[in-house]
Amino acid sequence: TATREALLALEQTTGSDVMDRIVNRNLLFAYFYGVGRGLDDAHYYLVRSRAPWHSMGCTVRDWEALMWTLPAVQLADTGLARELLVRACELHGYAPGQGVHYIDGTLFQPGFSIEGPAAFAIATDRYIRDSEDDQIVEDPVVADTLYLASEDITARRDERVPLYSTEVMPSGAPAKYPFTLHGNAVVALALEVFRRTLDEEAAAGVEDPAAVRAAIRRHFAVDRGEKARLAVAVDLTGNASLDDDAVGSLLWLPLYEALDRDDSLYRRSVRALRTEGAAPDASVSPLLPQIARLLGPEAQEVLAWLRRAPLDNGIAAEFVDAEGRAIANGGDAALAGLLAHTVWYAAHALGLRA
């Protein structure tokens, strides 16, 4: 039928039937449940999930919309991805990263996250790279958003050190210290994009991303030598936090080119994180860290776990039990998009096989 053919056209392949099932079930859910269209205005809206059993409902963070849902949609439909990117800029680009919004852009929960403005740059660059449509930066609303995002990030730079401060983690939790590892890794990647997409005069004033990455190694590494590991947040006066954030986890650093996944400092930090995260009662835990581990040294083990995990009838849930069964906030469309794209990326970019 025409419907079946249309759905098949959206599906992706990884070379593994097992991985294909995980990718495509979650990709299609993100495609249809992470995006809505207004009955009154016919405009597109990015949401956390249209599933009525998900508590976040029709709210959205810039980071989740642009870095979780959009990459999955883009795998299946670059035309829709373009419309969604422009629409996100229209609704949220005037004040990127300010917190949780309702679908119409009204602020629901305030709290500035440095990942928000960076996400607009990274999402634009990913779209250009995948679609070869570099004319999107000529769209006035996209161009304005990139300039505003660059200004917001620049305003957060420390006076002495090329690191950038935030108020909350991308999960919404208050940052224990103003300079976060995940936030600065993301900023470094965004700065690369600004250097390529802003006009010559503005681009010349953008911080060198290499300087930010060097500062990350210098200021976030705690201990030294063979015991060195990465802190999650610091204040640049000697205080540091090792408590990882479920959304802004250090596990994601290779994706932002901050550290290679084979880097010894990264691997030690991941091992320490796994040891400390092994709580005595792991009956309920976020699914997100498991997805992030697909980028690290435990990728094969995590993939085997995902093969067995029931999730929410195969769809990502925010909270799961030790076996991967959905406990709360099932039908998480944005998280389903992240799961689909991360498994696809692990297969195509990292060579992961089931």
Describe the predicted segments one by one.
Residues 1, 106-119, 126, 150-206:
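The feature captures the catalytic groove of carbohydrate-active enzymes
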Residues 1-58, 354:
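Acidic/polar, glycine-enriched structural segments that form the non-catalytic walls/loops
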Residues 26-38, 76-99, 129, 141-162, ...:
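Long, well-ordered core segments of solenoidal/helical folds
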Residues 46-54, 95-112, 163-179, 236, ...:
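Acidic/His metal-coordination segments adjacent to aromatic residues that form catalytic metal sites
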Residues 56-159, 184, 330-353:
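Aromatic-rich carbohydrate-recognition surfaces in CAZymes
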Residues 57-60, 110-127, 240-260, 282-354:
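C-terminal capping/lid segments that line or modulate ligand- or cofactor-binding pockets
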Residues 62, 148-151, 158-159, 176-188, ...:
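Extended ligand-binding clefts on enzyme/binding-domain cores
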